Amino acid sequence: MSSRHPSPAPRLDPAKFRDPRVTARGEPRAAVALGGLRTLWFNTGTLCNITCRSCYIESSPTNDALVYLTAAEVAGYLDEAEAAGEPLVEIGFTGGEPFMNRDLPAMLADVLARPARYRAIVLTNAMAPLRQKARALLDLRDRFGTDRLILRVSLDHYEAAHHDLERGEGSFAKALDGLVWLAREGFTVHVAGRAAFGGEDESTLRAGFAELFARHMIPIDAADPVALMLFPEMDAGADVPEITEACWGILGKRPDSVMCASSRMVVKRKGADRPVVVACTLLPYDPQFELGATLAEASRPVPLNHPHCARFCVLGGGACSR
């Protein structure tokens, strides 16, 4: 019988991920060039209505390390991208819980109203903050339709017990209630789960989610890897190989398949005068991935100098958007 709580992985060799240019073995470290900005993420703030046991960004009701962005700040970056002719397709909002930011509806309206017809995606737990913005969401639906507004709801597992273990007792029922409401109101909904959670393989997880969606009349195809994203586990302290320049050929992967080849994220640190641009949604705190205050400054290549670069993006094939 497979274990639902596997043995801990070997811990990371402290000699790894020290130098952005070379690995612990002295081999040239892989770096990823920005091939064109197709997805721009905004971290709306790290405050969240719940505290999750394994949150990679440590969001909680008290963590305001990344403060709320304003609609004007978001508009400034969108204006910069458009003036530079960036091939933007998708604008993402993450947190924390984005619906705790009172400016989120205005941000979404700005994105959806622009002539470029961007797609907007919001990562949400679909709990109380979303329901408190229900009227604003319905107004956005009525103004802009639902084709270009995607709500991706976090459900760690298709069973309440596993989800609640991470997010608190009763959180699964509340998230599911929000997901059902969104589906009933005609919004485009996706779900984000965890690929290795519960000790099950991917086919079992997708079958479990498919049954859940069918039972609650949620129009999500559980076989679609975009509509149901199953993310690799992230443990920055677990051992993982470093990615060298030679790894692309060995693994049969291309640098342009990695998130930082086509995306950046805007954050605003507590006490800062203005936002900054970081290389990756997963690494908002690490100073080596802070690239500058503008999108132009943030266009330089990104050395893959963090365990998440290897485990999540290159080896795990993860991406926050497709």
Walk through the language-model features, giving the residues of each.
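Conserved alpha-helical substructure of the radical SAM core
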Residues: 8-95, 99-114
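Short, P/G- and charge-enriched loop/turn segments at secondary-structure junctions
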Residues: 28-30, 140, 249-254
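Short, flexible loop/turn motifs enriched in small residues
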Residues: 48, 146-147, 258
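Canonical radical SAM enzyme core domain
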Residues: 62-79, 98-144, 151, 155-177, ...
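Conserved C-terminal portion of the radical SAM core fold
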Residues: 89-91, 119, 145-155, 170-240
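Accessory C-terminal segments flanking Radical SAM cores
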Residues: 232-322
